[in-house]
Amino acid sequence: MPPLPLITAQTEEKLLAFLTEHGHTKFRTQQVLDWVWRKRVTTFDAMSNLPPALKNLLAENFRFHTPEIVEIHGSADTTRKFLTKMEDGSLVESVIIPAAAAENGEKSERVTLCVSSQVGCAFGCKFCASGLLGLKRHLTTGEIIGQILSAEAIAGKRVNNIVFMGMGEPLSNFDNLADALEIITSHRGLEIGARHITISTSGFVPGLKKLAAYPRQIRLAVSLHGATDEVRDQIMPVNKKWPLSQLIPALEEWNRGRNQMPTLEYILIRDINDSPKDASHLVRIAKRLHAKVNLIPYNTVEGLPWKRPSEERCRSFRDAVHKARIPVTMRYEKGHDINAACGQLRLRKEQEKSGKTSR
C-alpha cells in the first residue's frame, strides 16, 4: 500500500476540494493551513481548534513527514550544504546561503536556499557533477517543500529567498514544481514573494513555454554557459535538441509582458568559453534579451577535465561585458571548500557507497 499523501504537499485549492467533498467549509481549510504553515505543527492532534471528526479525517488521508538531513557541511564563508535523504533512500542536495553584509555595514536578513527538483539530472552538462549519475526520478511536490522545511529546522531561521538551482532541470518537472510554487508563494503557505524565487533552466524550451504562461512573476535564470551553438554543443547536450535559434525566441516569449530582466548564468571555463570573442557573442544575446549576466568562474569537479580561468582572464571577460553596458556580476561560488557546486556532495556519497571513489 502506498504511503498517504503529505499534508505539506497540498495546495490550498487541492485541500479545499478534498474538505468540501467531505462536507467541510472553506474556513476549515484555512484553519488547517494555518496550523501547518503558521504554527508549524507536526501532528493533526495538535490542531486544537478543529473538531475531532475533522482531525480523524485528516489523519486517515494525510500524513506529516520531512526528509532527513544526513550530512551537513559547513564552510568558512558560513554557507552550509545539506545532503538530504528521501524516504526511498534517494539523495539530493540543498545549500543555505546567508546574505553578505550590506554596503553600509547593516546586517541583511536575506536567507537563500538553493533546492533540487530532481534526483540526478538527465541533461548531462559536461561540466556538472549532477548529471554524472544520470536521472533517477523527479522529486515530488512534498519532497521539494520538504527540503525547505528540513533546512529551516536545522538552520533555526526561516528561508525568504529560494533558488531552484540545485540538482535537476526544474522545468522538466513542471507539474510538481508548479504545485510547490503555489505552496511557497501562497498567503496560506510559506508566503515567500514570487520575486524572491528564481528558477534556473539549462534551456528546456517546452518547459520555458509553460513558464511563460504561468501567472506569477517568478524570476528566471538561464544556464547559458556558451553564447554560440558550437560552444553549447560541446558542453551542454540540451543545445543539440533546442539550439539557440529556439531558446532565444522562447526567452523572448517568457519576457513578453513582464517587467523583469532574465539572468544569463555563464560559467567561465578555461579555453572553452572565456575568450574576447565569446564575450562579444554573450553581449549580443544579453542585449537582445535585455538581460543581466552572472559570471561564475568554474568550480573544479574531481574527475572532469575542465579548469578555471585565471583571475586576470575572468576580470578581462567581465570588463568586456561591462563596457558594453550590460549589467554584470562576477560570483565566486560560496562553499568552494565543501563540495558546494551542484551535485558534488551526492556524487561523492554515491561513489563511496559503490566503492568507486575517484582518485
UniProtKB/Swiss-Prot annotation:
Q: This chain belongs to which protein, by name?
A: Probable dual-specificity RNA methyltransferase RlmN
What organism does the UniProt record list as the source? Akkermansia muciniphila (strain ATCC BAA-835 / DSM 22959 / JCM 33894 / BCRC 81048 / CCUG 64013 / CIP 107961 / Muc)
Q: Does the keyword section mention Metal-binding?
A: yes
Name all Radical SAM core domain ranges.
107-337
Q: Which family does it belong to?
A: Belongs to the radical SAM superfamily. RlmN family.
Provide the residue positions that the database annotates as binding S-adenosyl-L-methionine: 168-169, 200, 223-225, 299
The molecular function GO annotations come to:
4 iron, 4 sulfur cluster binding; metal ion binding; rRNA (adenine(2503)-C2-)-methyltransferase activity; rRNA binding; tRNA (adenine(37)-C2)-methyltransferase activity; tRNA binding
Q: Which reaction does it catalyse?
A: adenosine(2503) in 23S rRNA + 2 reduced [2Fe-2S]-[ferredoxin] + 2 S-adenosyl-L-methionine = 2-methyladenosine(2503) in 23S rRNA + 5'-deoxyadenosine + L-methionine + 2 oxidized [2Fe-2S]-[ferredoxin] + S-adenosyl-L-homocysteine; adenosine(37) in tRNA + 2 reduced [2Fe-2S]-[ferredoxin] + 2 S-adenosyl-L-methionine = 2-methyladenosine(37) in tRNA + 5'-deoxyadenosine + L-methionine + 2 oxidized [2Fe-2S]-[ferredoxin] + S-adenosyl-L-homocysteine
Q: Which CDD domains match?
A: Radical_SAM
Disulphide bridges: 114-342
User: What does this protein's record comment on cofactor binding?
Assistant: Binds 1 [4Fe-4S] cluster. The cluster is coordinated with 3 cysteines and an exchangeable S-adenosyl-L-methionine.
Gene (name only): rlmN
Q: What is the lineage of its organism?
A: Bacteria, Pseudomonadati, Verrucomicrobiota, Verrucomicrobiia, Verrucomicrobiales
